[in-house]
Structures are given as structure tokens and as C-alpha cells.
């Protein structure tokens, strides 16, 4: 996912193609949205301590969805690569064109059938076909047992959710809570990305620091992750890397996210399974010049209003990428590296944390996963970019929190302090990224560890 965006006016996301859009539940009492559907369909699960262990996908053969019973998920160790299936009886009246598919031919002919019926726009139909082929090729690269079955299982659910959104566009609230029932969008996203991750060549840096975070969250503190941003799969990769060691963090991160991942029909079902604070992407702020000022004001309201409310609540963990978008490779060397941070955006976030009235902690986080779902080489204005997908190793790493007062003690002005703190966080992210790059792309594995970045491997591989 890219990082991200801020709409404070709900009407900014209304679709003009459907008179009865589905609406996300919002924790804000001021939200102007009123769900037109049964509240049981969209009711989010309130997540809190004790830590929730989450789960394996549903039994695909029976077409059932995993749901929460007594606030406990099935053991993470039972999870597989097949995506969560829609529960029986959900989405009354929704076509079963894709969910009933039993072969690749059924899926692809279903796209053509809905296109001819006028229920699936041509550009979306073409994008779905392209996505299928790319996803299939990537999963087959893994040489996993039953890879073709995994592709069919995951893609029929993905197409089913995408087609449902085409017919009944879901509208995100400025603050969106992950939808876990009656369809578990969180596990759907996890298990869709899972077979794309080469766990044998994936690494976590300083896993003990994530344990420190969990203890701080249990005490009611707030945690902010200042991160680079690589792909739309970032949230799933973070959660997969931590799902066996730090499940509470995996499930409860709130991502500051851009408007593109909540408007593209092929992205929206995955976004519905994440906790999101929605803003307008900095890199697309001027795509339509006459809307630029409105977008800036909306972002300010979202970040200073809703973000402040979230932080004052305590026990929240928030992820934000101060670069304002995804990393891109150097046009000359073709090497990937974290995009520079915007010092003002980062300073605004720090001030919100400081003024929230509870103990706050700011950590630098590095992500390396661009091979799985690389963005276009150039920033594009149009919604609906091509989906390049591959099977590859990934990595995340976190460093100990960086204290503003310690970093800026010798600074002579607020502007100098702002720049120094931003640079300190960025330098830490870059240092960690280099270690991850050496481990994954340099082939050094665990030997890439340094005195400041201790690498381990996800327990999915070790088990």
C-alpha cells in the first residue's frame, strides 16, 4: 500500500455509479455516513488486549469464512495459502459467477460472461484477466505443492470481492476499521499475499523491539512507526513477518493511506481488511490543480482531527510514510532505496504524538518488498495501474525509538530541530534497509546482521 492520504469530508469518496453504496463503519461520531445495509454485515470487531492470535484461512472446500468466536482466532500455526472464502448466506443476491468457479476456464469465462452482460466494465475486465495471469505466474514460481489449486482458490475469492464492489461500491470513512465479518477481509488479504512471499529468504530485523512495542501498547502508550513505503502489499508483508511473534501488532496497526488504494476496484477489497486513516497522497496532490487546496485542507482536518482523537485514546499503533508515496528505483542505477522524508509532515506527526497527553514512542521502520508488487517506474495520475507480481523474499526491520529531545539538544532553532529529527529517522531507516537488501538481494542471509540490526527469520519458515 502506499502512504497515504486524508479525506475529512466523507462526500469526497462517494461513487457516482451506484445509488446505494456500501459504507464503512467509523469510530467517529461525527461521521456523515449512514450504512444502508444491515449493521451486522459491516460491523467491525473491536480489537483490544489481551492480544488476539489470528488465524488460518477458512476451509475452501466448504466455502466458509473464518469468524471471531469469543474474541479468539484459530491458531496462526494452522494458516495456509488459500484465501478466506465468503460465508454461506452472505451477500444475499450477489452473483456466484466467480466463487463457484472450479477451474481457470470457469474464472476467465466468467469475466467474459459478465462483460457481455454489461455488469463488468471493459477496463476492469481486462485488468482482472491481467491480474490473474500475473498472480498465477508468480505463485507457480514458488514451486509450492498444489500451487495451481492455491491460485484458483485465491483468485476466485479475489474476483468475487472485486465484482461485488463493482456492483455495490464500498465507500471508506475517513477512519476505516478492518472488516472481519461476515467476510474476513483481513485474512483474505493475508492469504492472498502469503504465497508470494519466499519465507526462506525473508528476514526480520530486531524482532525484540517489536516485543517492547507490544508491552508499551499493553500499558496504554501510543506507538508510531515512521517508515518507507514500497508497495500496496506493505501492510500484508508487515503482518506476515510478525504474525507468529507479534500478532497484536500485525492485526492492529492503523495505516495512514492514500486515496488511490480506496478507489481502485482491484485494490479496495484488500484495503477493506486494514485499519486505515485515509488522506490524499502528497504525490498526487496536484493531479487536478483546482482541487489541490481542498485536498490540503482535508488532509489537515484528518491528521489534526481524527489522528489526534486516535492518539488520545491510547494503545494505538500507527504507521505512516513521510515520503508521501512509494519508493522508486534510481533511473540511472535502477537501485531501490527509501524515498526522502518530508520534514514538515514528520514534525506534524511528532507534535500530534507529544500533544496527545499520553506517553508516545516513535520508531523508524524499514520495509523491503518491492519485488513482490513493484509500482510503475513513474508516478501515474490514472487510477488502475498494471499489476506486476512476483514470488520473492522480503524483509522488515525496526530500530529502537528515537527521542526528539536527545537528537535536537544542540539545535539552534525549531526549523533546524525539525530537519535534524527527520534526518535521524530517515538515516535509521536507510541503515536498516541496507542490511535487509544485503540479506535478501545480496544473498548474505542472517550473516548480513550488524551490531545495530540483528536479523532473524519469520517463524513460518523455521516451523
Curated annotation (Swiss-Prot):
Please provide, in alphabetical order, the Gene Ontology terms of the cellular component aspect for this entry.
chloroplast stroma
Acetylation among keywords: no
User: What EC numbers are recorded for this enzyme?
Assistant: 2.3.1.15
Q: What is its main location?
A: plastid
Location in the cell? Plastid, Chloroplast stroma
Alphabetized, the UniProt keywords read: Acyltransferase, Chloroplast, Lipid biosynthesis, Lipid metabolism, Phospholipid biosynthesis, Phospholipid metabolism, Plastid, Transferase, Transit peptide
Q: Which Gene3D superfamilies match?
A: Glycerol-3-phosphate (1)-acyltransferase, Glycerol-3-phosphate acyltransferase, alpha helical bundle, N-terminal
User: Low complexity bias: where?
Assistant: 24-37, 74-90
Q: Report which reactions are catalysed by this protein.
A: sn-glycerol 3-phosphate + an acyl-CoA = a 1-acyl-sn-glycero-3-phosphate + CoA
Enzyme's top EC category: transferase
- Where does the transit peptide start and end? 1-91
The UniProt annotation puts the region (Disordered) at 18-37, 65-95
Domain of life assignment: Eukaryota
Name the pathway it acts in. Phospholipid metabolism; CDP-diacylglycerol biosynthesis; CDP-diacylglycerol from sn-glycerol 3-phosphate: step 1/3
Protein's UniProt keywords contain Lipid biosynthesis? yes
Q: Which biological processes are named by the entry's GO terms?
A: CDP-diacylglycerol biosynthetic process; phosphatidylglycerol biosynthetic process
**What one GO molecular function would you report for this record?**
glycerol-3-phosphate O-acyltransferase activity
Short sequence motif named HXXXXD motif, residue ranges? 229-234
Q: Which family does it belong to?
A: Belongs to the GPAT/DAPAT family.
Swiss-Prot/TrEMBL domain comment: The HXXXXD motif is essential for acyltransferase activity and may constitute the binding site for the phosphate moiety of the glycerol-3-phosphate.
Explain the purpose of this protein: Esterifies acyl-group from acyl-ACP to the sn-1 position of glycerol-3-phosphate. The enzyme from chilling-resistant plants discriminates against non-fluid palmitic acid and selects oleic acid whereas the enzyme from sensitive plants accepts both fatty acids.
Give the protein name, as stated in the record. Glycerol-3-phosphate acyltransferase, chloroplastic
Amino acid at each position: 500500500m502506499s502512504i497515504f492520504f486524508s479525506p475529512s469530508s466523507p462526500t469526497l469518496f462517494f461513487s457516482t455509479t451506484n445509488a446505494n453504496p456500501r459504507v464503512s463503519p467509523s469510530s467517529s461520531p461525527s461521521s456523515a455516513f449512514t450504512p444502508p445495509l444491515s449493521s451486522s454485515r459491516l460491523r467491525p470487531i473491536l480489537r483490544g488486549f489481551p492480544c488476539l492470535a489470528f488465524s488460518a484461512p477458512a476451509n475452501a472446500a466448504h466455502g466458509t469464512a473464518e469468524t471471531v468466536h469469543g474474541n479468539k482466532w484459530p491458531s496462526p500455526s494452522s494458516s495456509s495459502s488459500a484465501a478466506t472464502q465468503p460465508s454461506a448466506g452472505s451477500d444475499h443476491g450477489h452473483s456466484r459467477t466467480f466463487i463457484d468457479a472450479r477451474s481457470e476456464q470457469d474464472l476467465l469465462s466468467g469475466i467474459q460472461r459478465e462483460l457481455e452482460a454489461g455488469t463488468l466494465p471493459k477496463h476492469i475486465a481486462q485488468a482482472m484477466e491481467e491480474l490473474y495471469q500475473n498472480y498465477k505466474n508468480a505463485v507457480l514460481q514458488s514451486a509450492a505443492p498444489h500451487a495451481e489449486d492455491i491460485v484458483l482458490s485465491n483468485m476466485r475469492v479475489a474476483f468475487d470481492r472485486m465484482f461485488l464492489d463493482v456492483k455495490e461500491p464500498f465507500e471508506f470513512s475517513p477512519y476505516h476499521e478492518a472488516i472481519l465479518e461476515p467476510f474476513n477481509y483481513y485474512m483474505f488479504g493475508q492469504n492472498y499475499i502469503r504465497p508470494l512471499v519466499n519465507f526462506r529468504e525473508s528476514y526480520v530485523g530486531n524482532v525484540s523491539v517489536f516485543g517492547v512495542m507490544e508491552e508499551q501498547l499493553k500499558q496504554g502508550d501510543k506507538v508510531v512507526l515512521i517508515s518507507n513505503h514500497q508497495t500496496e502489499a506493505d501492510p500484508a508483508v508487515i503482518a506476515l513477518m510478525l504474525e507468529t511473534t507479534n500478532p497484536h501488532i500485525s492485526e492492529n496497526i492503523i495505516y495512514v493511506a492514500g486515496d488511490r488504494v480506496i478507489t481502485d476496484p482491484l485494490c479496495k477489497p484488500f484495503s477493506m481488511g486494514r485499519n486505515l486513516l485515509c488522506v490524499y497522497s502528497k504525490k498526487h496532490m496536484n493531479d487536478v490543480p483546482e482541487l489541490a487546496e481542498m485536498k490540503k485542507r482535508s488532509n489537515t482536518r484528518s491528521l489534526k482531527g481524527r489522528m489526534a482523537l486516535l492518539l488520545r485514546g491510547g494503545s494505538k499503533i500507527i504507521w505512516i510514510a513521510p515520503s508521501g508515496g512509494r519508493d522508486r528505483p534510481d533511473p540511472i542505477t535502477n537501485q531501490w532505496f527509501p524515498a526522502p522524508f518530508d520534514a514538515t509532515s514528520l514534525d506534524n506527526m511528532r507534535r500530534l504524538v507529544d500533544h496527545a497527553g499520553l506517553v508516545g514512542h516513535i520508531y523508524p521502520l524499514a520495509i523491503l518488498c518491492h519485488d513482490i508488487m513493484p509500482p510503475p517506474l513513474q508516478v501515474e495520475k490514472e487510477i488502475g495501474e498494471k499489476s506486476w507480481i512476483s514470488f520473492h523474499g522480503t524483509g522488515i526491520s525496526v530500530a529502537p525509538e528515537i527521542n526528539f529531545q536527545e537528537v535536537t539538544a544542540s539545535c539552534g532553532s525549531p526549523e533546524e530541530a525539525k530537519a535534524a529529527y527527520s534526518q535521524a529517522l530517515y538515516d535509521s531507516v536507510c541503515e536498516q534497509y541496507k542490511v535487509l537488501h544485503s540479506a535478501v538481494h545480496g544473498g548474505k542471509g542472517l550473516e548480513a546482521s550488524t551490531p545495530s540490526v540483528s536479523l532473524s527469520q519469520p517463524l513460518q519458515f523455521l516451523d
